[in-house]
Amino acid sequence: MNNADICYCGSQILFKDCCQKYLVGTQKAPTALALMKSRYCAYATHKVDYLLHTTHSSQQKDYTKTAILNWAKANEWQKLEIIAVTENTVEFKAYFLDENQQEQIHHEFSTFKKENDRWFYVDGKFE
């Protein structure tokens, strides 16, 4: 993907004007929704460090860089659908093709927490 491409999150905004600024660290995601969308983009672009840095410290022990990278690379990310949003939760569906090119849907209810003016992913419940 180059800077002239539409953002993976489905906003219909250029990637460079949407989630890329969060992934490269020039801005912090201002809301749980913005963080969730940027994390989807991080999976699509294999930005594992961003995923780890935006996971709440209480949960980081459950994630390894290698496991995240392997899962992100094994799948071809198709689209993101936002179902419902509150201040600190996001329900979404992430559509992707798995390593066998089979269409899959990851349906999650994610919880986020704001600390020191930064949003973090805490956990998710899956359908």
Positions of predicted regions on the chain:
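Cysteine-centered loop/knuckle micro-motif
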Residues: 17-19
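Short solvent-exposed beta->alpha transition segments
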Residues: 49, 53-82
